[in-house]
């Protein structure tokens, strides 16, 4: 089957924003204007197409990023039909993992900001992730019809808070309830959308007289930015010649693709204004799969560099970026095709696990409605039903041309709770449910505590775990009691020691003999976390026994020495020892390694590390003193303060253990007028008195 839409007319984009910037509403409007659904779903009625899990509709927040396909030929039908694949990403900080995954498979992004709230904390996180994957982006300043809306203030914040280089391609005509349309700064015309047909038709008009001066100033800024794209445009501009509309657009597109500028548009999705022009900007300025550099990977040996270009002619390669459980068909694996073609029924290789998988059925999702398709090609995003053993980040490729595309890296969870099934019947279902959820979400871990026998689940924040427990109840009918949240502490050391470990059992018959010297030293935090070096020379310990020493050390790392928390950032070198011809065994050396590490660890100035969170509180000025005082009481370090339209933003670093129940306390301190967000920042050494208390509590158990 031939390709229906040429790959140059594909746009794979993400729509990304802070909670309440109106991102889901914006996506709904896109689906409406591109003719997919004929009745607009409002988020505050709980009817939006993209938010399809029951909890999302209740809480009004987006949790899973649904992928959707639509077609757009421009608001004046000025383009050939373009295929836009949209990935809707969640805005809550406990779900940054979802955002990270989507960024990985996108070619471009639309960042939605609220005209009142501006650039909020989560926007910064998403911005950093987009920078990490070098995703070209444009901004849409939404909610221009709301009280306190100020478009140019948001443009300024993009510069100051995100260190971006914003270039507005539109100006707002009026604001708040007087917001009527936008000025197109490229064409230098005003755009007015018809209210009668929900903004489907529009007219170009002259720019209102009170805006002409401002429009000229920003038009100049825009032309200058476009001219910087190439020497020939610059020469033409400096020579005093007018740049044509085509040249301006071409220059801006080049600079967006190079991540040098971010174009800013505005509107009100709720009032059906501006989304149409933003869609045109997606087509004109964001990249097609062919505009993006080839994706990098390695061959089977794990070292040889290889790449795949966006072309149907190259061998098939795709990246699984999300696993979802669907009530009707079981596992859905969302994947992005980077090169080649695959048909339903084909067998492909999961090169990360080295297992073959058969594509049973392939579906394309429109929010949670699905359409079966027979084939997918380079640039497509689709979901496969029935893949057995694929997890997020795995590569699917042609069996005759294996390649491993870059793996995604996922953060370690920082908070854990114990869950207990309420009845015997729940117990069996719970294991299955947790397994499914962990497969879908790599930032969620499940394990059994060996001492207490309890099932422990860990994730990125309180809301993350609440929603997982809630999903367990709704989707799998498992009722569970949830314990108090526990902090994921870590242990490490501060000095270097050398330590001997000797395990000898010789009392007639076959004995045991293992003897090893280890050097234990601290490593830079944030690196590999653990490294083992074999420095044994002259065969004093035969090399087949050295891996056993490493294994002994690694077992000890899992449950630390100080208080049983995992040990991180240590380097261990085996440099000496001895063995016995008959009595030595792997088991003996494993125990010797474990003993040496345990003793050495306690001599190497062991310390307890605690997770530190980056906290931002937005509060009316009257409560500022109380909020700061409270953060100080929680051992917080204030990083800085900023004025916002509604008061002040306080930024601080606070240990996670002090943040439990903060939402309730903050509400009572500020009569519910303040809001906060937090995300994991780093691990820091816990102060002595805190560490002692934790160690004693753990030992008492």
UniProtKB/Swiss-Prot annotation:
Coiled coil: none
Subcellular location per the Swiss-Prot or TrEMBL entry: Cytoplasm
tr-type G domain location: 8-290
Main location: cytoplasm
Binding site for GTP: 17-24, 88-92, 142-145
UniProt xrefs under PROSITE patterns: G_TR_1, G_TR_2
Alphabetized GO MF terms: GTP binding; GTPase activity; guanosine tetraphosphate binding; translation elongation factor activity
Cellular-component GO terms for this entry: cytoplasm
Keyword tRNA-binding part of the UniProt annotation: no
Record CDD domains: EF-G (cd01886), EFG_III (cd16262), EFG_mtEFG1_IV (cd01434), EFG_mtEFG_C (cd03713), EFG_mtEFG_II (cd04088)
InterPro entries from the UniProt entry: EFG_II, EFG_III, EFG_III/V, EFG_IV, EFG_V, EFG_V-like, EFTu-like_2, G_TR_CS
Keyword terms of this UniProt record: Cytoplasm, Elongation factor, GTP-binding, Nucleotide-binding, Protein biosynthesis
Pfam families on file: EFG_C, EFG_III, EFG_IV, GTP_EFTU, GTP_EFTU_D2
Gene Ontology biological process terms from the UniProt entry: ribosome disassembly
Signal peptide per UniProt: none
Function: Catalyzes the GTP-dependent ribosomal translocation step during translation elongation. During this step, the ribosome changes from the pre-translocational (PRE) to the post-translocational (POST) state as the newly formed A-site-bound peptidyl-tRNA and P-site-bound deacylated tRNA move to the P and E sites, respectively. Catalyzes the coordinated movement of the two tRNA molecules, the mRNA and conformational changes in the ribosome.
Family classification: Belongs to the TRAFAC class translation factor GTPase superfamily. Classic translation factor GTPase family. EF-G/EF-2 subfamily.
Name under which the protein is recorded: Elongation factor G
Source species: Sodalis glossinidius (strain morsitans)
